[in-house]
């Protein structure tokens, strides 16, 4: 989700030291927290709705398909919207749309129709997409260019804080409530949590509508002074988009299957509620890794760090597939630590030197987040065909590409 982002950005050379971007960055961390929280809550929603509607693995992965499919449909229009109305207004629009999506869970629970839940998730994800398109590049240009990747890694650490808290929140308010409910009332377990989230997004929208964050422009010269054309002309951006696709696909796929995997008798045999609490270790590892990475990657080469983490993730997945019991459990949970720097590192490397094409490039990268819709669906089909254990071979392919991008593909 890097040493510095290597850009030639004169925007900051004369003004960065004179401006205080601290308050704006602090406000943006709230958005990253909520984005991570709402996304990771799907990991709890999947086993819950799987039980409510008696779904197989492939059908339950439609939750991620609809959520991350929104990135594919909304990202490019969102990039144009943000470029037209400013980063701040884009953030406000994203928050409002996300609030509406959360509110739609109330009628979905009342009618107890799986398709309505999927529709609500799509609307919610559309709002989150707009937030991602506006917030990610905004962070990279709020401050010195040589520390852009470090700032993005730090804000992503708060995204990870949200993903760490979400499983516990979901375990208590969704899975535990569903355990005590009748079959007909199980779907209602999501109403109160998502009502709270709708209110939270609404409050944040009001706050950002009132705030006056610094207005910065994307006036850096692009690599080779390519003022014409589009962001698609940059090879490292295109390969980076593939990197985002496979990274998000792998991360979402692993996270989506954790509750069911840890509930498997051959692994840990945990109850779904206990398994959900353990999911916090996976996302907590990513949080810790991002805080460490925010400081360490000021001194470490971006690409080499990315490749190293990808290789370790591959080793951990092989251990997960080849073993059972607590070794398999802790191996898969440890992957979160090495996922930590991947998204911000790929993102910052891919946006290097895009200049006036930065908004479009950000939209393309967010478009690639559709990997979170496709890869889990494939792993779901594998889980139905060969079992949930062997299905963890799928993310290995994704991490292999990430290693390639870190060593070779990111060179511009």
From Swiss-Prot:
Gene3D superfamilies: MFS general substrate transporter like domains (1.20.1250.20). CDD domains: MFS_FucP_like (cd17394). Its main location: membrane. GO terms for biological process: D-glucose transmembrane transport. Keywords: Cell inner membrane, Cell membrane, Membrane, Sugar transport, Transmembrane, Transmembrane helix, Transport. Pfam families: MFS_1. The chain crosses the membrane at residues 21-41, 62-82, 90-110, 113-133, 158-178, 192-212, 239-259, 310-330, 331-351, 363-383, 388-408. It is a multi-pass membrane protein. One of its GO terms (cellular component) is plasma membrane. InterPro entries: Glc/Gal_transptr_bac, MFS, MFS_trans_sf, MFS_TsgA-like. It is found in: Cell inner membrane. NCBIfam families: gluP (TIGR01272). Belongs to the major facilitator superfamily. FHS transporter (TC 2.A.1.7) family. Intake of glucose and galactose. This is Glucose/galactose transporter. It comes from Brucella melitensis biotype 1 (strain ATCC 23456 / CCUG 17765 / NCTC 10094 / 16M). The lineage of its organism: Bacteria, Pseudomonadati, Pseudomonadota, Alphaproteobacteria, Hyphomicrobiales. The gene is gluP.
């Amino acid at each position: 989700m890097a040493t510095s982002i290597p850009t030639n950005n004169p925007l900051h050379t004369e003004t960065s030291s004179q401006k205080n971007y601290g308050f704006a960055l602090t406000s943006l961390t709230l958005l990253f927290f909520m984005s991570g929280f709402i996304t990771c809550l799907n990991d709890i929603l999947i086993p819950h709705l799987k039980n409510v509607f008696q779904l197989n693995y492939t059908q339950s992965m439609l939750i991620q398909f609809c959520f991350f499919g929104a990135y594919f449909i909304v990202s490019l229009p969102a990039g144009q919207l943000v470029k037209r109305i400013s980063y701040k207004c884009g953030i406000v629009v994203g928050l409002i749309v996300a609030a509406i999506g959360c509110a739609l869970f109330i009628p979905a629970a009342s009618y107890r129709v799986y398709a309505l839940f999927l529709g609500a998730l799509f609307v919610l994800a559309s709002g989150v997409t707009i937030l991602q398109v506006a917030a990610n590049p905004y962070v990279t240009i709020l401050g010195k260019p040589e520390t852009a990747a470090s700032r993005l890694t730090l804000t992503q650490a708060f995204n990870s804080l949200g993903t760490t808290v979400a499983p516990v929140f979901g375990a208590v308010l969704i899975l535990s409530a569903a355990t005590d409910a009748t079959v007909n009332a199980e779907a209602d377990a999501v109403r109160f949590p998502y009502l709270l989230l709708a209110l939270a997004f609404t409050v944040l929208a009001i706050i950002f509508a009132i705030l006056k964050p610094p207005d910065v422009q994307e006036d850096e010269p692009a690599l080779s002074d390519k003022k014409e054309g589009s962001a698609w002309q940059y090879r490292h951006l295109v390969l980076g988009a593939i990197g985002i696709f496979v990274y998000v696909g792998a991360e979402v796929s692993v996270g989506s299957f954790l509750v069911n995997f840890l509930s498997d008798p051959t692994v840990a045999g945990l109850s779904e509620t206990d398994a959900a609490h353990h999911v916090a270790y996976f996302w907590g590892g990513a949080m810790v890794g991002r805080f460490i990475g925010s400081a360490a990657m000021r001194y470490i080469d971006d690409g080499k760090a990315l490749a190293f983490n990808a290789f370790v993730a591959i080793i951990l997945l092989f251990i997960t597939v080849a073993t059972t019991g607590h070794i398999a459990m802790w191996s898969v949970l440890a992957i979160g630590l090495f996922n930590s720097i991947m998204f911000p590192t790929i993102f910052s490397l891919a946006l290097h030197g895009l200049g006036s094409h930065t908004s479009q490039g950000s939209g393309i990268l967010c478009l690639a987040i559709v990997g979170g819709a496709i890869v889990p669906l494939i792993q779901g089909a594998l889980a139905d065909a060969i079992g949930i254990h062997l299905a963890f071979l799928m993310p290995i392919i994704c991490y292999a590409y990430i290693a390639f991008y870190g060593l070779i593909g990111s060179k511009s």
